[in-house]
C-alpha cells in the first residue's frame, strides 16, 4: 500500500535539480495532511523562500572546508557537520544523507510533501513516525532493535556508512534521529548544522521530486517495521544494532529519579508550557512539568542563524540554570524530540551519556496518578 501511495505522490512530478538562481519559497501548505508515510498525500506545488544568512565557518565543527575532505576526519565527539563540509563530501560512497523533517501537530506542515518539493541531493526520507514503536499510542516512540535494523536495512544504510541527518527547520527533528542511531550503537552520525534552510541560504543545489529508488526505500522501511511488529520475517536485515540502554529512560526510571534524585532533569519545552501557563499542542494533555525538573528551552542551544552555539556559550546556558556538567543529566520534552537537542548541546561539551526520557511529558501527563507542578500549584 505504501509503495502505491508514494507512486501517486512522488512520481507525479519530474525529478529535477533546483539551482540557487531560481526563486526559493518556504513550503507552508494550508492544511497538514499527514505525518506518516501511510497517510493520503495532496499536491506539493508551493515552493521555498530563501533567507539571507552569513555562512558559518567550518572551524565551528572542528573540520576543514575543502573538496574531497574525507569523512573519516570527522570526530564523533562533535554532534554536527557544516553545510560546507557536506557539500564537499556529497558524493562520498559511504555517506548517507537523511531528510528527517517532522513538525509539531499545530504547525500544519507536511514533511513528505516538502521533501518532494526540495531536498538535498542523494537524501533519503527518514519517517520519524514510521520508524517507531507500533505497539503504543504514544507518538514516535523508539522501535525495537530488530525493527530499527529492518528499517535502516530497507533504506540501504550499512554499518560502515557515515550518516548525516537534516530537517526543514534548521535543527529540530534531525536531533531525534541522531539520538536514535546512537541508542542503537551507530556512532558515525551527525546533524547538519542549520539544516536545509542553511544549505539553501549557502547557495547549494536542492532536488525537486524524488527518484524511484528513494520512494521504494522509504516505503519499504515503513513496511518492514510493520511486518516486524506483526511477527513476520523480514529479510535481508543487513544493518546490525547494539542497544545502548543508558541513553534512553522509561517512565519508571523518571519516577525513581523524582523520588530519589541522582540525575539532574532538564526539560526542553518552552517556559510557558513548563510553567503550565500555555496549553500543550496535543489535546487532552495536562499542563505543567515533572517535579524536580528544570526548564532549558531548546532554542537556547542556537545562535541567530539556528546553528549550534560554540561550547563556551552552551556552557553558559546550562550554568544559568545551575546545571552541573560534573553530575549526571537526563533530558525530556514533549515527545522526546527536542530533548535530543539539549543532548546535542551537552555532547558538544563532552557529556556524551545523556539519556532521553522517551515518553517525555506526553506519557507522564496522561498518567492521572502522577504528580505535576505548575505556576498555579506552587503559588
Curated annotation (Swiss-Prot):
Residues 91-208, 259-373 form the Rhodanese domain. Induction: Induced during senescence. GO terms for biological process: embryo development ending in seed dormancy. Changing residue 340 to V: Reduces thiosulfate sulfurtransferase activity 4-fold. Slight reduction of 3-mercaptopyruvate sulfurtransferase activity. The modification N-acetylalanine is found at residue 57. Residues 1-56 form a transit peptide. CDD domains: TST_Repeat_1, TST_Repeat_2. SMART domains: RHOD (SM00450). Keywords: Acetylation, Mitochondrion, Pyruvate, Repeat, Transferase, Transit peptide. GO terms for cellular component: chloroplast; cytosol; mitochondrion. This is Thiosulfate/3-mercaptopyruvate sulfurtransferase 1, mitochondrial. Transmembrane segments: none annotated. It catalyses: thiosulfate + hydrogen cyanide = thiocyanate + sulfite + 2 H(+); 2-oxo-3-sulfanylpropanoate + [thioredoxin]-dithiol = [thioredoxin]-disulfide + hydrogen sulfide + pyruvate + H(+). PANTHER family: SULFURTRANSFERASE, THIOSULFATE SULFERTANSFERASE. InterPro entries: Rhodanese-like_dom, Rhodanese-like_dom_sf, Thiosulphate_STrfase_CS, TST/MPST-like. It is found in: Mitochondrion. It comes from Arabidopsis thaliana. One of its GO terms (molecular function) is sulfurtransferase activity. Disruption phenotype: Shrunken seeds with unmature embryos.
Amino acid at each position: 500500500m505504501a509503495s502505491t501511495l508514494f507512486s501517486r505522490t512522488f512520481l507525479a512530478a519530474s525529478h529535477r535539480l533546483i539551482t540557487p538562481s531560481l526563486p526559493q519559497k518556504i513550503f507552508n501548505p494550508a492544511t497538514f495532511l499527514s505525518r506518516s508515510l501511510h497517510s493520503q498525500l495532496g499536491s506539493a506545488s508551493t515552493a521555498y523562500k530563501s533567507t539571507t544568512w552569513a555562512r558559518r565557518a567550518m572551524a565551528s565543527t572542528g573540520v576543514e572546508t575543502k573538496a574531497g575532505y574525507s569523512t573519516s576526519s570527522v570526530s564523533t565527539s562533535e554532534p554536527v557537520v557544516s553545510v560546507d563540509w557536506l557539500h564537499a563530501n556529497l558524493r562520498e560512497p559511504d555517506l548517507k544523507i537523511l531528510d528527517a523533517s517532522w513538525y509539531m501537530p499545530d504547525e500544519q506542515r507536511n514533511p513528505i510533501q516538502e521533501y518532494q518539493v526540495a531536498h538535498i541531493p542523494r537524501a533519503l526520507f527518514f519517517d520519524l513516525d514510521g520508524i517507531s514503536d507500533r505497539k503504543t499510542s504514544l507518538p514516535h516512540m523508539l522501535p525495537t532493535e530488530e525493527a530499527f535494523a529492518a528499517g535502516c536495512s530497507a533504506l540501504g544504510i550499512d554499518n560502515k556508512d557515515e550518516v548525516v541527518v537534516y530537517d526543514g527547520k534548521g535543527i529540530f527533528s534531525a536531533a531525534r534521529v541522531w539520538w536514535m542511531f546512537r541508542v542503537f550503537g551507530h556512532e558515525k552520525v551527525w546533524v547538519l548544522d542549520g539544516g536545509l534552510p542553511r544549505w539553501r541560504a549557502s547557495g547549494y543545489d536542492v532536488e525537486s521530486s524524488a527518484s524511484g529508488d528513494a520512494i521504494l526505500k522509504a516505503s519499504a522501511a515503513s513496511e518492514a517495521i510493520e511486518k516486524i511488529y506483526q511477527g513476520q520475517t523480514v529479510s535481508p536485515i543487513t544493518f546490525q544494532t547494539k542497544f545502548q540502554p543508558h541513553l534512553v529512560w522509561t517512565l519508571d526510571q523518571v519516577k525513581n529519579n523524582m523520588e530519589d534524585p541522582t540525575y539532574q532533569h532538564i526539560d526542553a519545552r518552552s517556559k510557558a508550557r513548563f510553567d503550565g501557563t500555555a496549553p500543550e499542542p496535543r489535546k487532552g494533555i495536562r499542563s505543567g512539568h515533572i517535579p524536580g525538573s528544570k526548564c532549558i528551552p531548546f532554542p537556547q542551544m542556537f545562535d541567530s542563524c539556528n546553528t549550534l552555539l560554540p561550547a563556551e556559550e552552551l556552557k553558559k546556558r546550562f550554568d544559568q540554570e545551575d546545571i552541573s556538567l560534573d553530575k549526571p543529566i537526563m533530558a525530556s520534552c514533549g515527545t522526546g524530540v527536542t530533548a535530543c537537542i539539549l543532548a546535542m548541546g551537552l555532547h558538544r561539551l563532552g557529556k556524551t551519556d545523556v539519556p532521553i526520557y522517551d515518553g517525555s511529558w506526553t506519557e507522564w501527563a496522561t498518567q492521572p496518578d502522577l504528580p505535576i507542578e505548575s505556576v498555579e500549584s506552587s503559588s
